[in-house]
From Swiss-Prot:
Residues 17-209 form the Lon N-terminal domain. Keywords: ATP-binding, Cytoplasm, Hydrolase, Nucleotide-binding, Protease, Serine protease, Stress response. It is found in: Cytoplasm. Belongs to the peptidase S16 family. Induction: By heat shock. The active site is at S686, K729. It catalyses: Hydrolysis of proteins in presence of ATP. It holds the Pfam family LON_substr_bdg. Residues 599-780 form the Lon proteolytic domain. The gene is lon. This is Lon protease.
Amino acid sequence: MSTPLPTQDPPDIPEVLPILPLNNVVLFPGMFLPLVVSGDTWVKLVDEAALATKMVGVFMRTQPGEGFDPLALARTGAVALIVRMLRLPHGAVQILVQGQARIQIRQLIVTEPYPQARVAIHRDPAVLSVEVSGLARAALAAFQQIIQLSPTLPDELAIVAANTAQPGMLADLIAANLNLKPEDQQLVLDTLDVQERLRQVLSFLEREREILTIGRKAQEEMSKSQREYVLRQQLEAIKRELGETDDHAAEIAELRRRLEAANLPEEARKEAEREISRLERMPPGAAEYVVARTYLDWLLDLPWNVSTEDNLDLTQARQVLDEDHYDLERIKERIIEYLAVRKLRLEQDASGSARGPILCFVGPPGVGKTSLGTSIARALGRKFVRVALGGVRDEAEIRGHRRTYIGALPGRIIQGINRAGSNNPVFMLDEVDKLSVGFQGDPAAALLEVLDPEQNVAFVDRYLDVPFDLSRALFICTANRSDTIPPALLDRMELLELAGYTEMEKLEICRRYLIQRQRNEQGLAERAPTITEAALRRLIREYTHEAGVRDLERRIGAIYRKMATRAAEGQPLPDQVDAPDLDDLLGPPRFRSETLLGEDEVGVVTGLAWTPTGGDVLFVEASVVPGNGQLTLTGQLGDVMKESARAALTYARSRARALNIPTDFAQICDIHIHVPAGAVPKDGPSAGITMASALISALTDRRAYKHVAMTGEITLRGKVLPIGGVKEKVLAAQRAGVRTVLLPKANAPDLRELPEETRQQIDIVLVEHMDEVLPRVLHPKSESVTLAEPAPPDGAGTVQAT
């Protein structure tokens, strides 16, 4: 209850007052009002006002908020006298204020540290007309009647109102205690003319009296058995008399308005209408109410017909792609082709639309697969959505959960579309090769419908249970390897392989992207020293050994962190970082190509392997010792690799005479083939010619050239069969310092994928038979060998010549 001040002389009000905005609260002159003030600005205002005049100007905000906006303040406020102040925890202050007079802002003087303004003070005139007195009596009588009808207004309020001599203050008292909206109370406060103010209050009193009369009648008709029902009827009657609808009806009306604006497809629209009708008949307290409302929110919020316009300027799109990524020409061309097709179709038919291709980027970590998706979205002018699928084992993550489950939601595909806000985003499915199969189903199988151009026109999420058109989206998948992707899923995607970068490409990427990015991230910007080309080359060769550039960027970041530490300590920074400085900044080198290859040895041959992280150099060792013909294979070899070793042994036996090897070596010797890095599992057929070369090197006591690397499958007749991963393997050979690479002749078309720089640095020899391999791998030796004598201690593992 708000009560007026006792009659006393009004205090002197300063012309300049601090301004305190209020949310949904109106203070009338002569009334008490408790306030809780928080926020550093407003607490400071109250503290300083309490020490000075104890007066502040309070105005209601027309739009609730936290800051100060003079345009968002009501036209009229009140002078508030601080009567009592109490500090609360967390820095807030509780104050009790008394309204003194109406004020209006004439001029805003300052806004910092808190707003202060020059105000105009409005007081009610002392002498009033007879008409005003009559209106005041009518208002008092109506107010006393409402106090009798209302269960919330105390009877003492009638005495206070009767003792209020000033008509203007009586109007303020009534407006402060009636159940009015803040906007209606502000309307009374804005009315400076007392007569007009009383008329407004009388209209509010009449409305309140009608409401209370309806309530009294409803209460009189109430019985025990009908209590709950009648209470609802009473509320509805009040709302109808006010010309308002209840919250439930307003919510239904809002849903219907959103349905009209959403422009849903026919099937989705019918489902939404059915669900809204069901919701309309359901009481808001029902358990199913929230479930149905959440479903409708998803259905109406989805961008069924909201699309972003494609950027069809091919030159600009190409420029954006080149800005973000170096090289990757094949992928860039594929995106430009899609844009070109889209542009031509639109020229033929304005409503025509090309279905988005479903691309799959396969390559080792750090080559830019994920970041390429963002670049493609920017080039196309589309929204970008990324969903990480690594470790997902429940197909409901893709297809959504049925609404019968508690907490059910749509799958990640529909959630991503909703997050994008358009039905044609660039949608990246990251790490699609790392999906898991669990007892909840196979998520890879669930992706078949998403990624099939013939089916995703009407993709049905289990939660929505209505078709949604995914064909406008441009789906991009990423994977480190394609052999772990189910064949049916792989068949629906256009595979684009991203091999590792060459040294020159890494240098260019460093210059264009990595160095500047790390400078900014480490807080150096333009103060950072330049890293010379020699230092970058040494970084690439001796401190990293990867197909991508992720570790290289980490090393560059480590260099600039050292420089940032020096700068923070006030030490001078060098102008540049050169190759010799890397030992102090990064420690000793981690890799050395010359150490990796080493000296030519008997029984040790350099092979090439493909791994999910790119190509790698693989050494195969073979030793021959006296024994009874036992073959030992070590190094965690898979079944295919073991079969390659047996095929190599059979080939060596069949060619023993031609190779000047005793034909009975398989009966008098034990053979041990080992592939180092024994803790790492290895498999695949491409090490066949490498194993055969190592075995023949050991049997003939001929050293093998370490700078010659090879890959290829071998048959029992010595033919060299094609293999995969040619580009990755050749790039790995280049990183290791290999000078010659032997490849199956059938892989000749794959050489077109190699960078020109690689073809110039490495001598690539195409072979069809082991007879072409051995002369290029083994040192020449004319002597024959004898295998029956035991090998001396210093020659263990080799066959001595006789």
